[in-house]
C-alpha cells in the first residue's frame, strides 16, 4: 500500500500570498468554505491500494484507478547529459542554414532563372516540403513564401487551374506528384487552391488510375496524393475518393516493393497520416529515410540532425525543471493519480519545436497534468463533499482556503493557484495586458463541468448522448490545455480575437468534441470498470437501442472522421483574424492528444507507442 501524505504546502509561507487577482465582476459567496468543517482539517492520511475501492481510517470509501505510475526513472532524467550545446554545433548549424538559404535564393523568382523550366515547380515544392518535414522550416520562412508565391502563379493560371500542374512551368503535361504536392503545400499555407484539379487524374469512368507498373515515381505520386487527401474540407468528394484509392494502392505496393527508405516512409504515413502525426516524430523518421544522393540533400539532413540534438539539450533542462516543479508540489505522493508529466512534456515538445517556445512547452505540460490529476480526483478518488469544497476553492481563488481542503487536495490546489498565476504573468509579457481574469473564468467553467459527472457516477445516472457531450467536451479540459499556452507564443491576441479561437468558438469546440469522442472509444471499458458508466459509447447505445458496442464505436469514429474535415477548414479558412501560429498550435495539441488515442488509451497507462514517442523525441539524440 502507498501512503498519501501531501504536506509540502502546509509549511509554505502563506503571508507571501494575497489575493490581488480577485474577479471584480463576480461577487460570490461560497458557504462550503465559510462553513469549512474542522473534521476535514484533522482527517488522517489515506492509504491507497490498487483495488477498485478502498477505505481509510475514518471509514471513507474511495475508488482508485488501476494505474502503473511513473514509468521514467527520475535519476535518469536528472542525469540526462548532452554536448550539443557546444559552440561548434551552433556554429555548424548557422553555416548550414546559410548554405540552404543560398540554395533557395539561387532559384530566383523570374522566368529567366537558372532552374530548368521543365522541373522548376516541383523542385520548389520539394524544397519547401523537405525543410518542413525535417523540422527546420523556421529558418526559411521568407524563402518558403517566395517559392510558394512562384508556384501559385502557375497553379492558379488559366491553363493549369482546371488541370493541375506539370513538373515545370513549360511542362507539356500535368503531373500527379507535382499537383498533389502543390495542392497540399499551398493549401496548408493559406493559398486558395481547389481540390477539383484532382479530377484530371481520373479515367473516363471517374476512377483514379495509374499504370499499374508501380515505378518509384508513380508510387511517390500516389503517396503525395494520399498526403493531400488528408487535408480535405467538408463536401470534397474527390478528396474522399483520393484517400480511398491511394490507401489501397499504397498497401498493395508495400506487398511488392523491397524494404527501403520509400517503404518505411509509406508505412509511417499510412500509420500516422496527418491528424495523429506529431511533427517532431515525423522529423526523426524523415531524416532517417531522406535521400542523400547530392551534397545539398546531405546538408539538409545534417542540419536537421544538428538542430534536433541542439533542441534535445534544451529539452533536458526543461524536463528537469518540470520534474522539480512536480516534486515541489508533492505530486509523487499522490498514488491515486497518473504520474505522466514526462509524457505531457514530450507532447508539448513534439508540437512546439522552436527553442524560443519554452514557456509554451512547460505551460502545456503543467496544464495537461492538472487536467489529469483533477480527472482522477473528480471521477474516481474524491468524495462529493470534498469535490464541492475544491470547486468552491477554485472559484474563490485565494490561498487561504487551502486550510478547508482535505490533505491530499492542498498541494494540488496550491499548484494550480501558483502555476496559473505565474503563467498569467508570463503571458502578460506578450499580451501587454493581464489575462488572469479571463483564464479564471475558463477554470470556473471547466471545474463546474466536473460536478454533473461526479453526480452521475454517484447516482448511477446515464445521460443522453447530447447531454453527455455538451458537458464532457468541457470537462475533458481541452480549453485549459490550450488557452494559457497560446497566450505565451509571442502573438498579441486582443480579447475579440482570442474569442475566435477560445471556447466556445467553433475551432476550439471541434477540438474538444473530437478528443472527447476519440478518448471515450479507447477508455470506456476501463472507466466502466472504475464505476464510470457514462461515456459517449454507452450514451450513444442508450439513445440507439439494440446497437452493439462495436457498431457504436464505428459510428463515433465516423463522426470524428467528418469532424476532422471541419477542423481542417476552421484551421485553414481564409479571412481569419487569429494568427495562424496560434491556430496551428491549438490544432497540433489536438493532433498530439489524438496520437495518444490512436490504438488504445495512451494516458491511463503508458503504451508502447507513448514510450516510443518519449524515447525517440526527448530522451535519445539522433546519431550524427
Curated annotation (Swiss-Prot):
Provide the residue positions that the database annotates as binding Mg(2+) 1: 375, 379
UniProtKB keywords = Chloroplast, Lyase, Magnesium, Metal-binding, Plastid, Transit peptide
A GO CC term?
chloroplast
Biological or metabolic pathway of the protein: Terpene metabolism; oleoresin biosynthesis; Secondary metabolite biosynthesis; terpenoid biosynthesis
What's its EC? 4.2.3.52
Q: What subcellular compartments does it reside in?
A: Plastid, Chloroplast
The family database entries (PANTHER family) matched by this protein are listed as: (E,E)-GERANYLLINALOOL SYNTHASE, ENT-COPALYL DIPHOSPHATE SYNTHASE, CHLOROPLASTIC
What is the official name of this protein in its record?
(-)-beta-phellandrene synthase 2, chloroplastic
- What organism is the protein native to? Pinus contorta (Shore pine)
The gene for this chain is TPS-(-)Bphell2
